[in-house]
Curated annotation (Swiss-Prot):
NCBIfam families named in the record: GGGWT_bact
Species of provenance: Sus scrofa (Pig)
GO cellular component, one term: perisynaptic extracellular matrix
Name of the protein this chain belongs to: Tenascin
Region called Involved in hexamer formation, residue ranges: 23-185
Segments forming domain Fibrinogen C-terminal: 1520-1735
Similarity remark: Belongs to the tenascin family.
Residues forming coiled coils: 118-145
UniProt cross-references to Pfam families, sorted A to Z: EGF_TEN, EGF_Teneurin, Fibrinogen_C, fn3
Residues bearing PTM Phosphoserine: 65, 70, 72
Keywords: Cell adhesion, Coiled coil, Disulfide bond, EGF-like domain, Extracellular matrix, Glycoprotein, Phosphoprotein, Proteoglycan, Repeat, Secreted, Signal
Annotated GO MF terms: integrin binding
């Protein structure tokens, strides 16, 4: 036995055997073959490939099992690194390759079952197989080579070399894959032998210490850098924030001071006495007493404390800066009070007459004024009068002590009493002032009161109109009750005018003059009786409206004669004779008759027909119909019928008609002995009305019928074009049947309650995109076709929409190193979110964080300042991920560091800080007092050094400031670095000596601006001993006592706060004696003056100061400085009758004495008072006044205008006068009036007043510029200047007035928004303040307005409609005129009520100008104009002639207007549209390329530049073809095409599915579609799957039509296959009755049956096989047939037909083979495969018959 034979035996045994060393497997192990070879082995110099598959089934009786999931399962079954499925591939062109692989896996034994007979049989087979393999191995290692002898058969041996290498015939051993070694490639091998730096364990390197990597080639870093750095060549490069050899130490963010601290775990540990981030900050004094924080070695105190060490109390609210704070207590400034000086103090303490609230006095009852010093009037006179010394002087209309009572008009005329200003009139009186007589009960509001008597309104009467009157006073036939007549008996009606009928005619008639006219059917005087019809004709009596007839008469009115026996109820009685009903006869219709005498097809028995066989019905006239018609089966194109019939029938007529409109009725007949049939060639999805008639002796029965609809087909080829988050786009294959719409349904399989989304699509749509879906949801998509409101079966597919990414990503709370990223969760259900961030445009620098699905924010840290970052978020679920959603943000600027104070003065502070990391432009310093106040800010440039300095100036002394420094760059600003710093205290101000004595000095000074605690006073004694005195902060003076006289002293005064001191204020002074003054006296007192005298030390004083103070504080203080030598003074210019206090003090060098005082009262003088102005006119007014009687000799009155533009007027009046009328003044002028009395030549104090003369009216009103809606009004202004003019205008006929106000300098204005054609009354009034002049008036009439909004509409070539908005004013008529180029003007007049006018007889394509204006009497409005162009008129008489199947001739007559061309449009019923533009001279056009049997619509339009005429239209139908769109070559041939060549066919007769094919019209009657031709070898047929699906080659030479085309063509119906073969003059053919190719889902499965011919049935071997190419192997052989034979076909194992093989290659199975004609070793010269419909001959015969 040869080697190959042994191999074949081994393969057979291996297919049955199962390794049993470790037990028996429970499940079937199957490995799919991937590649292989054919059974014939080559010569010894050629390559060989062995590749085998085991199909091993366990015996049914085995009860053993192996737990493949446990540790002793799979791990023991597979080799150490065996993949889950063994896949062996070899290259396409590996011609010198040998592969022989044999492998058996033996699992461990799972249970003891070796004694089972079937297991023993397997073990024996396995032993035999191992023997064969061993002998084979011995032969292959003997040096004689391997597998040298050719052999045939099937190889089913398992691959050798453990599936990890290839068997080599040269070395007769395994060539292992990388990573494996050993004779059977079963030992793992480590990469690069671990570079001798480690051990190889199970194929993986276990590296020695110090090395790492897959092959131990890399140096390892200490502790792997603790995941805090990168390892580079064995050295750790630490990440930011870490240091050390192994990156284990955290570095401090700010380097620690080397002198004051050290870095421990990333934080500075400071030495005692220092603090801060870098230990550079010294601690504060007393640790701020625990009442503040230490900043820059100074305490920033908590609220309520202050001082250097926060040891001092702060006053409440810092006394609001309204007082001084001494140890927590406020000493308030004048005008303020309260614990915190927060309350305003009231003037003079409200003089004890009220209480102080918020700085204002709330006075006690009876007092008023800012300080409650004034007496108050009762109830403040109710604001209706003036309060004079506690008494009310009431305004006009008010009276009473407090002006609280209203004064009544006319004193109620003496006929009533006054109550609250209104008259309560006496009985019988009314009116505002009770002056009118009153009517009884005020006429009840139903009449007018005239001189105390009521004049009643219509419908009322009585002395007080309280009674209702009746109409016509009831005509004296009734009485009037509450305005309604109650009629006497016998009368009725609203006014009792009508006579009444008896019983009101019982509601059955009308009452006319007291008599009843009864309705039809009623009688009697009161219409109460029923009347009989025609009064029973006198042949009966009337009883209750019904006639009781006499014998021999009948009827409702007894008008008919009676028939015998009443015709037995079987006939009609006509004039006493019976007219019998059908079926009855005789005088009384008592006998029965048969209908139609049984039509001679039966016998009449007792009135019933006994019908002959086959007939039925009452008269035997009907053929017995079939019964129980049922539909037994329905398909897309057929309906099976069955029925019953027991009667004799000649034949049956089957008639079927579509139920839709215009359905064509069709019929056929079947023999009478047949009770079933099949209706064929029906249209799918159409409802048919089917009737079956029985035919007997050429007579039809009534039909039995049924309605049935043929089934709709299922759509095909539904696939997904695109799948997105919220949309899915699908496409599918078209169908060749007629139907209405596609219906596509989307259903969410995750949320059934959401319902379905249904969309209907029109043909020929084959794609659809559904939006609005939910992300990450599983959807079922079903596709149906709909026809006649019926939905066909659906094609379903399932898909899942993509996950949506998180949305609305936002970076919040962004600082210089952190950012909070927030987002909206995705709509889809997800497992988690992947967040990635890094510096933008730096791709490698990215950090990724995995988050849970519930999170919607994440805080990012350790960012760089002022850096743009990019964040992306991706949703993940299992292996699905969304598109990334991205957002960018920029970190903020970092704050300055180590901010500190360098120095300060009392008004400045100098700062220094370290610059931040970000490159800031400037630094912004904001500062404000900690105690409160406005903040200020400055900006300083950034220093190029590491630190920046700045000085704040203009500060308040001794004030602690809160200071913040932030970095600024553009519009960005960092967080501030903050510090508190205080300015120095300022020294006391104006330090001086105010009083010198021999042993004392009085010191004065002003308080410093700063807040401080105390003063320290220092001076030295003449002995040199220093003296120090501490003074309270509220001190502003101090007396030094115990001094030595005549000594000079230097005195220093310092303000202090805590340990802080101001610079000292300095003064020098000497002690001396003090002069004196005294004996101040008053003499020579007059009303306006008095004299003073006093004594004083001679020569001691430089000056004296005299102060005169009004004791009531009403007058200003008067101060006089006189020489120190004077001892008297005369004081004049005083107010008479006033109390004065006089103060006198002396001023000596360096000393001011204490003042001495005295009192004095000036004498009173006579008064003139109460000067009043009244009765102002334009040229004057009246004056009145009061004066003491008998005191004055005369009065002097002075009058002058306040602007002093005229000479003053002075009038001397008699002593007795108290009033004077002043005239001759200017109008509207303000005058000053002064009046004083003359007594004994002396003037009294004058009284004064201000008076204004009244305004004059405007004059001479005129009008100009009058339009339809506006006019200009002018006037002459009055003499006096006024503030404004008010112009009022209103239509004369009435309406709302309009008002315009203009400036007082204007003399005219424009009145707008007037109504056209209306007369207006216009008034002008001058206004000044609240004063108005008398009006000046005039009238004007506005112009007539014209129509507006002129437009044209409904424009045709000869007509147009003019429309306009009417004039606002009523007009008599409108005048219309229109003209065009070369068209004379036409004028028409229409009524003023018209708003449109039809323009006719226009010229086409002509521009017209249209004008219109309104007329009213002599008035004409303005004219409005518009232009329009008439349409181009259409071509005429468009007709289609010479119509053929593909051509037609269109002719027409030109329009009247000139044209530049014609647009010709013709459209078929399927919507195909074509347009042609022809020249202006053309009047006919020949159409070509039309489709046969097609209805066309042709339209033509004339063109003239931009103008287009209306379309003229005609329709025509081309001459028909049998098949306008042939679906294959047979239909093309039936259309009359008989020449072989290229043709266009239409799949499913669908014009949209064109396909070019080669038709063979000669072979076997023609009609063949050729889909394969081999003739010369020019075309390469060794192609991939894609090429064979699409097709390739030249249709006139060698080609392959394509699998897609074949599938669609054969899906149209049943086709037959013909194969024509030729070789050197020999021919053969093969014909198969049934041939089809499946779709791509079946991999184009072949179905071929019904052989006949001369070539032999070689195709039967390939029936049911899918198509194979070298890149898509579907054959059943152990090899890749397409790869082996360099072709493609429906291979099995492998072929009997290989028409796509190598042309001219006679090698075994390599050439163009047809096995049953030339065998496998001969390549045929010519071969064609072609197809046509199986019923072609029937179709051809039908065509010939037609």
């Amino acid at each position: 036995m040869g080697v190959v034979t042994r191999l074949l035996v081994g393969t057979f045994l291996a297919s049955l055997a199962l390794p049993a060393q470790g037990g028996v497997l429970k499940k079937v192990i199957r490995h799919k073959r991937q590649t292989g070879v054919n059974v014939t082995l080559p010569e010894e110099s050629q390559p060989v490939v062995f590749n085998h598959v085991y199909n091993i089934k366990l015996p049914v009786g085995s009860q053993c099992s192996v737990d493949l999931e446990s540790a002793s399962g799979d791990k023991d079954l597979a080799a150490p690194s065996e993949p889950s499925e063994s896949v062996q591939e070899h290259t396409v062109d590996g011609e010198n390759q040998i592969v022989f692989t044999h492998r058996i896996n033996i699992p461990r034994r799972a249970c003891g079952c070796a004694a089972a007979p079937d297991v023993k049989e397997l073990l024996s087979r396995l032993e035999e197989l191992e023997n064969l393999v061993s002998s084979l191995r011995e032969q292959c290692t003997s040096g004689a080579g391997c597998c040298l002898q050719p052999a045939e058969g099937r190889l089913d041996t398992r691959p050798f070399c453990s599936g990890r290498g290839n068997f080599s015939t040269e070395g007769c051993g395994c060539v292992c894959e990388p990573g494996w070694k050993g004779p059977n490639c079963s030992e793992p091998e480590c990469p690069s032998n671990c570079h001798l730096r480690g051990q190889c364990v199970d194929g993986q390197c276990v590296c020695n210490e110090g090395f790492t990597g897959e092959d131990c080639s890399q140096l390892a870093c200490p502790s792997d850098c603790n995941d805090q750095g990168k390892c580079v060549n064995g050295v750790c490069v630490c990440f930011e924030g870490y240091s050390g050899v192994d990156c284990s130490r955290e570095t401090c963010p700010v380097p620690c001071s080397e002198e004051h601290g050290r870095c421990v775990d990333g934080r500075c540990v400071c030495q005692e006495g220092f603090a801060g981030e870098d230990c550079n900050e010294p601690l504060c004094l007393h640790n701020c007493h625990g009442r503040g924080r230490c900043v820059e070695n100074e305490c920033v105190c908590d609220e309520g404390f202050t001082g250097e060490d926060c040891g001092e109390l702060i006053c409440p609210k810092d006394c609001f800066d309204r007082g001084r704070c001494i140890n927590g207590t406020c000493y308030c400034d004048e005008g303020f009070e309260g614990e915190d000086c927060g309350r305003l103090a009231c003037p003079h303490g409200c003089r004890g007459r009220g209480r102080c609230e918020e700085g204002q006095c709330v006075c006690d009852e009876g007092f008023a004024g800012a300080d409650c010093s004034e007496r108050r009037c009762p109830s403040d006179c109710h604001n209706r009068g003036r309060c004079l010394d506690g008494r009310c002087e009431c305004d006009d209309g008010f009276e009473g002590e407090d002006c609280g009572e209203l004064r009544c008009p006319g004193g109620c005329s003496g006929h009533g009493r006054c109550v609250n200003g209104q008259c309560v009139c006496d009985e019988g009186r009314t009116g505002e002032d009770c002056s009118q007589l009153r009517c009884p009960n005020d006429c009840h509001g139903r009449g007018r009161c005239v001189q105390g008597r009521c004049e009643c309104e219509h419908g009322f009467q009585g002395y007080d109109c309280s009674e209702m009157s009746c109409p016509h006073d009831c005509h004296q036939h009734g009485r009037c009750v509450n305005g309604m007549c109650v009629c006497d008996d016998g009368y009725t009606g609203e006014d009792c005018r009508e006579l009444r009928c008896p019983g009101d005619c019982s509601q059955r008639g009308r009452c006319v003059d007291g008599r009843c006219v009864c309705e039809h059917g009623f009688a009697g005087p009161d219409c109460a009786d029923l009347a009989c019809p025609s009064d029973c004709h006198g042949r009966g009596r009337c009883v209750n409206g019904q006639c009781v007839c006499h014998e021999g008469f009948t009827g409702k009115d007894c008008g008919q004669r009676r028939c015998p026996g009443d015709c037995h109820g079987q006939g009609r009685c006509v004039d006493g004779q019976c007219v019998c009903h059908e079926g009855f006869t005789g005088l009384d219709c008592g006998q029965r008759s048969c209908p139609n005498d049984c039509s001679n097809w039966g016998q009449c028995v007792s009135g019933r027909c006994i019908c002959n066989e086959g007939y039925s019905g009452e008269d035997c006239s009907q053929v017995s119909p079939p019964k129980d018609l049922i539909v037994t089966e329905v398909t897309e194109e057929t309906v099976n019928l069955a029925w019953d019939n027991e009667m004799r029938v000649t034949e049956y007529l089957i008639v079927y008609t579509p139920t839709h409109e215009d359905g064509l009725e069709m019929q056929f007949r079947v023999p009478g002995d047949q009770t079933s049939t099949t209706i064929r060639e029906l249209e799918p999805g159409v409802e048919y009305f089917i009737r079956v008639f029985a035919i007997l002796e050429n007579k039809k029965s009534i039909p039995v019928s049924a309605r049935v609809a043929t089934y709709l087909p299922t759509p095909e080829g539904l696939k997904f074009k695109s799948i997105k988050e919220t949309s899915v786009e699908v496409e599918w294959d078209p169908l060749d049947i007629a139907f209405e719409t596609w219906e596509i349904i989307f259903r969410n399989m995750n949320k059934e309650d959401e319902g379905e989304i249904t969309k209907s699509l029109r043909r020929p749509e084959t794609t659809y995109r559904q939006t609005g879906l939910a992300p990450g949801q599983e959807y079922e998509i079903s596709l149906h076709i709909v026809k006649n409101n019926t939905r066909g079966p659906g094609l379903k597919r399932v898909t899942t929409t993509r996950l949506d990414a998180p949305s609305q990503i936002e970076a919040k709370d962004v600082t210089d190193t952190t950012a909070l990223i927030t987002w909206f969760k995705p709509l889809a259900e997800i497992d988690g979110i992947e967040l990635t961030y890094g510096i933008k445009d730096v791709p490698g620098d990215r950090t990724t964080i995995d988050l849970t699905h519930e999170e919607n924010q994440y805080s990012i840290g350790n960012l760089k300042p002022d850096t743009e970052y990019e964040v992306s978020l991706i949703s993940r679920r299992a292996d699905m991920s969304s598109n990334p959603a991205k957002e960018t943000f920029t970190t903020g600027l970092d704050a300055p560091r180590n901010l500190r104070r360098i120095s300060q003065t009392d008004n400045s502070i100098t700062l220094e800080w370290r610059n931040g990391k970000a490159a800031a432009d400037t630094y912004r310093i904001k500062y404000a007092p900690i105690s409160g106040g406005d903040h200020a800010e400055v900006e300083v440039p950034r220093s190029p050094q590491t630190t920046t300095k700045a000085t704040l100036t203009g500060l308040r002394p001794g004030t602690e400031y809160g200071i913040g420094v932030s970095a600024v760059k553009g519009d960005k600003e960092s967080d501030p670095a903050t510090i508190n710093a205080a300015t120095d205290l300022d020294p006391p101000k104006d330090f001086r000596v105010s009083e010198l004595k021999e042993s004392s000095l009085t010191l004065l000074w002003r308080t410093p601006l700063a807040k401080f605690d105390r003063y320290r006073l220092n001076y030295g004694l003449p002995s040199g001993q220093p003296v120090e005195v501490q003074l309270p902060r509220n001190a502003t003076s101090y007396i030094l006592r115990g001094l030595e006289p005549g000594q000079e002293y230097t005195i220093l005064l310092t303000a202090e706060k805590g340990r802080h001191k101001s610079k000292p204020a300095r003064v020098k002074a000497s002690t001396a004696g003090e002069p004196e003054i005294g004996n101040l006296s008053v003499s020579d007192i007059t009303p306006e003056s008095f004299s003073l005298s006093w004594t004083a030390t001679e020569g001691a004083f430089e000056t004296f100061t005299i102060e005169i103070i009004d004791s009531n504080r009403f007058l200003e203080t008067m101060e006089y400085n006189i020489s120190g030598a004077e001892r008297t003074a005369h004081i004049s210019g005083l107010r008479p009758g006033n109390d004065f206090i006089v103060y006198l003090s002396g001023l000596a060098p360096g000393i001011q004495t204490k003042p001495i005082s005295a009192t004095a009262t000036t004498e009173a003088e006579p008064e003139v008072d109460n000067l009043l102005v009244s009765d102002a006119t334009p040229d004057g007014f009246r004056l009145s006044w009061t004066a003491d009687e008998g005191v004055f000799d005369s009065f002097v009155l002075k009058i002058r205008d306040t602007k002093k533009q005229s000479e003053p007027l002075e009038i001397t009046l008699l002593a007795s006068e108290r009033t004077r009328d002043i005239t001759g003044l200017r109008e509207a002028t303000e005058y000053e009036i002064e009046l004083y009395g003359i007594s004994s030549g002396k003037r009294s104090q004058p009284v004064s007043a201000i008076a204004t003369t009244a305004m004059g009216s405007p004059k001479e009103i005129t009008f100009s510029d009058i339009t339809e809606n506006s006019a200009t009004v002018s006037w002459m202004v009055p003499t006096a200047q006024v503030e404004s003019f008010r112009i009022t205008y209103v239509p004369i006929t009435g309406g709302a007035p309009s008002v315009v106000t203009v400036d007082g300098t204007k003399t005219q204005t424009r009145l707008l928004r007037l109504l056209p054609g209306v007369e207006y009354l216009v008034s002008v009034i001058a206004v000044k303040g609240f004063e108005e002049s008398e009006p000046v008036s005039g009238t004007l009439t506005t112009a007539l307005d014209g129509p507006s909004g002129l437009v044209t509409a409904n424009i045709t070539d000869s007509e147009a409609l003019a429309m306009w908005q009417p004039a606002i004013a009523p007009v008599d008529h409108y005048v219309i005129s229109y003209t065009g180029d070369r068209v004379p003007e036409i004028t028409r007049t229409v009524s003023g009520n018209t708003v449109e006018y039809a323009l006719t007889n226009l010229e086409p394509a002509t521009e017209y100008t249209l004008r219109i204006f309104a007329e009213k009497g002599p008035q004409k409005s303005s004219t409005i104009t518009t232009k329009f162009t008439t349409d181009l008129d259409s071509p005429r008489d468009l007709t289609a002639t010479e119509v053929q199947s593909e051509t037609a001739l269109l002719t027409w007559r030109p329009p009247r207007a000139s044209v530049t061309g014609y647009l010709l449009v013709y459209e078929s019923v399927d919507g195909t549209l074509k347009e042609v533009v022809v020249g202006p001279e053309t009047t006919s056009y020949s159409l070509s390329g039309l489709s046969p049997s097609t209805h066309y619509t042709a339209r033509i339009q004339a063109l003239n530049g931009p103008l287009r005429s209306k379309m003229s239209q005609t329709v025509f139908t081309t001459i028909g073809l049998l098949y306008p769109f042939p679906r294959d070559c047979s239909q093309a041939m039936l259309n009359g095409d008989t020449t072989s060549g290229l043709y266009t066919i239409y799949v499913n007769n669908d014009k949209a599915q064109k396909l070019e094919v080669f038709c063979d019209m000669t072979s076997d009657s023609g009609g063949w579609i050729v889909f394969l031709r081999r003739k010369n070898g020019r075309e390469d047929f060794y192609r991939n799957w894609k090429a064979y699906a699409a097709g390739f080659g030249d249709l006139k030479e060698e080609f392959w039509l394509g699998l897609d085309a074949l599938s669609k063509i054969t899906a149209q119906g049943q086709y037959e296959l013909r194969v024509d073969l030729r070789d050197h003059g020999e021919t053969a053919y093969a014909v198969y009755d049934r041939f089809s190719v499946g779709d791509a889902r079946t991999r184009y499965k072949l179905k071929v049956e019904g052989y006949s011919g001369t070539a032999g049935d070689s195709m039967a071997y390939h029936n049911g096989r899918s198509f194979s190419t070298f890149d898509k192997d579907t054959d059943s052989a152990i090899t890749n047939c397409a790869l082996s034979y360099k072709g493609a076909f429906w291979y099995k194992n492998c072929h009997r037909v290989n028409l796509m093989g190598r042309y001219g290659d006679n090698s075994h199975s390599q050439g163009v083979n047809w096995f049953h004609w030339k065998g496998h070793e001969y390549s045929i010269q010519f071969a064609e495969m072609k197809l046509r419909p199986s019923n072609f001959r029937n179709l051809e015969g039908r065509r010939k018959r037609a």
